[in-house]
Amino acid sequence: MDDKWIPVTEPLPLEKRQLEGMKVDVLLSPYDVPEAVRGFIRKDHKVFLIEFKYISQEDTIERPQSEHVKLRVGRNSGRLYAIELDLQKFGANHVQLRLEVAEALKNVLTHLVKEPVSPMRATNYKMAKKVVENHEDCILQPI
């Protein structure tokens, strides 16, 4: 396992909201923004795992997303801590595998943003998607 974390350098995003007829900018909590991300293959289980590290850590629970995708979210916060992709689903060569995993990862994150596991963490899921998009080459390097 490559446990090298990739530092996340994205600035805290502003989210524009309408409150009682006024437009306001809401800053995402630094506790919801990953500090680092990593991707690696768990060879014993033939799983590609993408993990997110935050300022504070907590116990996680597993949430199946589909037959071949599992999410690990914070037990109390609902923050996204990991995405597990079952590599046995992909019966492709090395180059094709990387493309298929990248596509599956984008689909999982897009679905998570549209239908959040925890509606209160929708901005955390958007930030996780942005982090993965910005660091995709490094995250998928083990494949």
Segments from the language model and where they lie:
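Short, solvent-exposed aromatic-acidic interface loops
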Residues: 85-91
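Intrinsically disordered terminal and processing segments
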Residues: 1-70, 75-76, 91-143
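Hydrophobic "anchor" residues
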Residues: 79-80
